């Protein structure tokens, strides 16, 4: 496209600096920010945030060395990119280790995931069993998308009968 695309290492460095800038903007510290990639004379956020102490930060991904460490250090939520129970369980364990290393309470991080591989209308009972397994791991939200559904309205209506059971799974997971 004609726009330089930095290598992965530099993109993660920039992301971390952007998170540091956001944290500083949302605090009482309006002083300068001097990073490797960004330098700001002031970090002012006017008007201030409505959510206190700051808006929640969600970081998506599953990279074990960088992404999940950034989640442990800066985020309130993690959207895992994983496709099966074992992988999600492993990523959560890695995130817990990062939290331990940083002195972060893992329970303060909301775990979400993309469920594009799940096909709730093909096998509703299997889908519900799978969701229950994810809930037991601590996943509190699974994003579903119909993909290239010929009739998205029919897809959503097909999910309607599953809602009471999904609600029960959610209640059991949190209560």
Q: Locations of the language-model features?
A:
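Active-site-adjacent structural elements that line small-molecule/cofactor binding pockets in enzymes
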Residues: 1-175
